[in-house]
């Protein structure tokens, strides 16, 4: 427990420093907000002035560029294009980001499988509650399956799932089981030079190890997200790997 206690002290210090940085940024954002508010009051006629009770500060959104999270931006666009081009008779997604699944359902018949209930209904999207470790499908039954940035989380307890040190391996095996011969699988995972466990958050995998989990599937395409770049080159260090694999006949 001594090691764990020391880690908590170091981690708390890191969080405190981060919060101090955020606090300084917030202070500057508030200054800009009130400066802007006073300037607006000088511009608007009396009957068009904003009231204090309706002020809605949107701090930190006055950036020079549109803020984009690159992982979901690139991986979802990549998977969406691949699936729409293939135009399967039906597609099953397991645990991916809900915006990706909702948009895809407007083009392709989609069933969304997730361990937690879907809070909002959508007329083009069929929802099936279930676990990626025990999918409600027969062997060799599906033509097209996706699971974007999901399998690396399985077994770490982040989303209320049971702890399992082989969670990723079991999840990939289950996705392989339900795909029909010739079926397409779309996955994305964090990659690194060696396998790592960032406990409670996710795992990262070496390319060699992750592709061994996909065997004997054929790798149709590999793409990599390095920071703000989407590339065909693996390079070294951390990245997100996007995989299109196909089950052999």
Which residues does each PLM region occupy?
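Hydrophobic anchor at the start of a short beta-strand
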Residues: 110, 185, 220
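N-terminal accessory regions of S-adenosyl-L-methionine
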Residues: 1-85, 89-90, 198-216, 220-228, ...
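A conserved beta-strand element that flanks and buttresses the S-adenosyl-L-methionine
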Residues: 146, 151, 155
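A short glycine-rich, Lys/Arg-flanked "PGG" loop and its adjoining helix->strand segment in the class I
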Residues: 163-184
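A short acidic, Gly/Pro-enriched loop at the edge of an enzyme's catalytic core
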Residues: 133-145
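Conserved class I S-adenosyl-L-methionine
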Residues: 157-159, 184-209
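Short conserved AdoMet
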Residues: 105, 180, 215
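Class I SAM-dependent methyltransferase SAM/SAH-binding core
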Residues: 85, 90-135
